[in-house]
Curated annotation (Swiss-Prot):
Gene name tied to this protein: Pus7
Basic and acidic residues: bias regions: 184-197, 690-700
Single Gene Ontology BP annotation: tRNA pseudouridine synthesis
Disruption phenotype: Neurological defects, characterized by behavioral disorders, including increased activity, disorientation, and aggressiveness. Impaired pseudouridylation oF tRNAS.
Entry GO MF terms: pseudouridine synthase activity; RNA binding; tRNA pseudouridine(13) synthase activity
Disulphide linkage map: none
Species of the source: Drosophila melanogaster
Keywords, sorted A to Z: Isomerase, tRNA processing
Name recorded for this polypeptide: Pseudouridylate synthase 7 homolog
Amino acid sequence: MGKDRGRGRRNNHSGPYNKSNWRGQKKDRPQNNGGGQRNSAPQQKSTLLETQVGITEFTNPEAPGFTGILKSRFSDFHVNEIDSNGKVLELNDLSVPKVAIVAVAENELDNWRKELEAVIGPEVWQDIANLAKAKNDPAIEQKVEIDVTTLDKEQRTQVHQMIKQLYKGKLLSTTIGQQQAKPKVQEEASLENKDAAEGETSTQKDSQVPAEEKKTIKVFKPKPGRGDKRWSFPADYVTFLVHKTNLVTSDVASTLAARLNLRPSQVNYSGIKDKRAKTTQKFSVKRRTPESILVAARSQRNVHIGNFGFESNTLKLGDLQGNRFRIALRHIAKEKREEIEQALQSLKERGFINYYGLQRFGNSASVPTYEVGVALLKHDYKLACELILKPRDSDVEFLRPIREEWWKNRDSAAAAAQIYGEKFIEKKLLDGLARFGESDYSSALRQIPRNMLMLYPHAYQSLIFNRIASRRIKEFGLKLIPGDLVYVEQDQSEASEEQAQQGEALEEQKEEEPNDEPLEVPEGDEAIEEESIFKRKVRPLTAEDIASGKYKLCDVVLPLPGHDITYPSNECGAWYEEMLAEVGLSSDQLKHKEKTYALAGAYRKMIISSSDLKWSFRMYNTPEDTLIASDWELLKNIPVAPEPAEAEANYMALLLEFSLPTAAYATMFLRELLKQDTSSASQTQLEKQAMAKEDNEKKAVGTQEEQMEVVKEVADEDGQETEQAETQGAEEAV
């Protein structure tokens, strides 16, 4: 009986190995349930790998790599913008400024009053004072009119300012102009106005001349509850910080624009921030009150705004120094701590290769964006259109059959009709083919926003840069060589990079916002001419320069190929023409007749320093533990998960904090550290392996616990049987 009882407990045992430990809840685990094809589809997609876009080398290949999971949760990746003054932007003030009238000193008001009373008369000011004291009567218009025709603009402005300062919204004022007939005798006395009157058609009688404008300031009481709703903030542009979670920057901006009755291009920011992250960045809009902006932001989940300010100019793409990153890498092996410390120190000392990351080249290995760029540069518009519309396994589910149908029958109108909304460039291209004819590929391409079209040739530029950087590091290592390019003057370095990176920020935005209005950035001839000023301000290093010790490897820039660029005077310079020739191009051919596709060239740092890198190790117990507090959580005093003692912790994470300049990719920083592919496919596979390992470990723990329980039960049963036998023997003896 005891043995049966023991077996029953073992069979019904529900130890840890039977529980779901995937992200803490069973409902979160992906289930097959006969629908395996849908869940397995992402695994079958052909995604770009780093080696396919020239990312092959490391600054220190000997440094130990290690496994860490990036962006396991979006709370593991935090980005704070660094503004043009070098300040890290943090959301820490939720107060909303009210209508602010610029204060004027009392003595200045007295001076204005004395000056104006001489012209207007003290009785006018008394009338205004009486108006302010009078009760509101909606039946009549309560006003005082002041003839200010003889006052200049500055004096009229002073009148308005005095009314604002003295009556604080109880009275409003406005300037009214009206045409009045001017007596001929007055014209004769005002010969200086003769030229202004000549050439105007007049219908006045002989005793009159063309009318002049009479100016009147009307001072009036506002309607009850209205007050002064005119713009009275310190400057035209309202700035504010946007803290978002797991959202696309351009989507946040578009929603704000819709709520504020603005075009998307009228909500400005300095650059795109990561989607799967918690990010803080600066926005600006023109003449929208902080209250209205706050109301608009409340309509979006996972968006918080604050830190309002006022500026005279709008934000533009590239108006920043860089970004501050706080990142958690999960599933770090505790026994690898010493090796990880070595890898971190190496990265801090040597920096990393400033590759363009995978997001630069699209999400399809079968049709990377640079292939479209090559077709455009070679004037093969038919091929470019076909590549953009070509079926691919990385498509969203509804778009794939539309592509396949078009590929078979080339009915652009029918295909376009199946794509709803204006988000997809495929729809714009198909609409263009339907409108201009199935063979007018050049005109059809122009239906795609210009900034989006620029993405394609720029992706090819980026591919060349990556390949050149890899070959330069592989063949010459981490040393300066004669002919390497540096900026002529150090203070021009930042300006040149900022100019080039402004174009890059635009491209990054258009990857996520292809259908927005054109933004206020240099384009076409203007952009090429403006950038060329900087591109010629480099020079090759000499042997004497290198011997002087004045320059470091992080000073070296590599060109992005173009028709107006200085190439290195060493062996690297020839590599550009070799790589262009591989696809039938040359630098001269990059001066395209279509300015949208023309590539003048730019410069980009080859190595990025990581001197401000900080790190720490963090213990945690569950995959759901929040390890880094966001701006919002700090502001609201929302605690992160408590950290257990290392001996008691189930897992260890590596917390990183570092800054990067604009246009540098954090994924390339992490690649140098981890020595592993940072593609989404690789990260997904790593996380699956980590979770499988975790499940196996828990199963092993469960098996051990079960075995221990069985041993204990058997021992208990044996003890009970022995006790029963002894009792029975004693009874028999009696």
